[in-house]
């Protein structure tokens, strides 16, 4: 059991299309030379990008936030080059990359320090064995001020961990509720 390196990630992308699209190295600048929050392959992980699709939490209906009966009207949907998250609120987004996780691997996804140092916290649950889809990203603004997130730039790092043995039942085999998700996905039961 251990954390996989850039060579393993690159090999899994070539053989099994584990990450699509895939950036072979860390990207820090756009073609025009302007800086971006880095994304792409790193030494022991992959820095995923956030897409242009966002759902910003507003609670205009004064709903109780209930994971068993979540009201999707609590979100305002938008597509943009950036997302302004209200103070002490959050947004959902999705990764640019589509992931296919091997049966004997689980991932941990951690927010990039560039955002964390600004009070913007990213939460993503592990990508389980044989899970496949776009990752839904939870982005919290812990500050008393509006916070800006840049689409098509790095948001979080995925670390791939080798299991000591393959699992008995994979996420796909138990028909996980977030299997093959395409867009920003709100809570499901």
UniProtKB/Swiss-Prot annotation:
Catalytic activity: dCTP + H2O + H(+) = dUTP + NH4(+)
Gene behind this protein: dcd
Pfam families with a match to the protein in the record: DCD (PF22769)
Name this protein carries in UniProt: dCTP deaminase
HAMAP family hit by this protein: dCTP_deaminase
UniProt-recorded Gene Ontology molecular function terms: dCTP deaminase activity; nucleotide binding
Family: Belongs to the dCTP deaminase family.
PANTHER family linked to this entry: DCTP DEAMINASE
GO BP annotations listed: dUMP biosynthetic process; dUTP biosynthetic process; nucleobase-containing small molecule interconversion
Class of the enzyme per the UniProt entry, highest EC level: hydrolase
Residues binding dCTP: 112-117, 136-138, 157, 171, 181
Alphabetically ordered keywords of this record: Hydrolase, Nucleotide metabolism, Nucleotide-binding
Catalytic-site annotation from UniProt: 138 (proton donor/acceptor)
Function: Catalyzes the deamination of dCTP to dUTP.
Pathway annotation: Pyrimidine metabolism; dUMP biosynthesis; dUMP from dCTP (dUTP route): step 1/2
Keyword Hydrolase: yes
Subunit-structure text: Homotrimer.
The EC number(s) this enzyme carries: 3.5.4.13
Organism of derivation: Methylacidiphilum infernorum (isolate V4)
